[in-house]
Amino acid sequence: MENEIINVSGGEMLEAINRSEIDGQIATAHKFPRDIMQCKQNMVALAAMDDDVAYNCFYHLERKDKDGKTTVIEGPSVRFTEIISACWKNLRIAGRIIANDGKTITAQGVCHDLESNVAYSTEVKRSILTSKGYTYSQDMQVVVGNAAVAIAQRNAICKVVPQVLIASVVKEVQAKALEHIKQSGVQSQWKSCVSCFQVYQLTDLMLLDYIGKKSSEEVTAEDIQKLAGVYNAIKEGTTTVEETFKKPKQQEAIAQQAQAAAESAQKKAEKAMSRSQGKTGTAAKK
């Protein structure tokens, strides 16, 4: 028995090592529990430390349903969830690509709260096809994959950290960003905003049309903040320029054409009905 050889597979050894690491992290988390109010104060302090950081802390999306109603989607950006995870502490976060079928990339994000033992896993799909149906180059697939992983991690973190806390912090940071826009001058911030969007070949007229204004003089601080959220959503890969600025216009044009065609058909039908009734009346007199 003393000379008996025990074979341990690599998988079992790796599992034992991982379990040991996690057990150690859980023990440390319980030894140094978080102070929720202190965590919140730290989040706000870091997010509002610099004006640029505050602008980058949230995203803004608008989507229209089949009835034409606009739904506003807002939340913490990828950069802000990095601040959240650092301040919330005792989190174990991971992200990876789990599938690539040549058409879409699927990323997985995992977040485990070692203190409360709450864990979530989220998946995000991103297309890797051009508008003409060709597959992205190797480099572009890497870029899309990295963005998908970051978004999947963000979604997992937002599942683990209480949403009521995140919403409260986002609201405070947005208020500070709005205050800075007003103090520094709306027109000055508008020029900076237009300059940022030029990277995506978007003009000031396109931005004005998006916020529903006819001239830059009508732009408000709230409009600047909304565009900052849209810019963050495009930059981190939550949406695209085409989905936000081009597709809505195309859908609107198609809807207008369909409505015009329907009205034209209705008028033709009414004329045909009128002619038919006229002929019937004449025949009756005869």
Residue ranges and their predicted role:
Residues 258, 262-265, 269-272:
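Composition-driven recognition of long, low-complexity, acid-poor segments enriched in small hydrophobic
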Residues 1-105, 110-258, 284:
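Polyanion-binding surfaces on beta-sheet-dominated domains and ring/shell assemblies
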Residues 270-286:
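Long, low-complexity, intrinsically disordered segments
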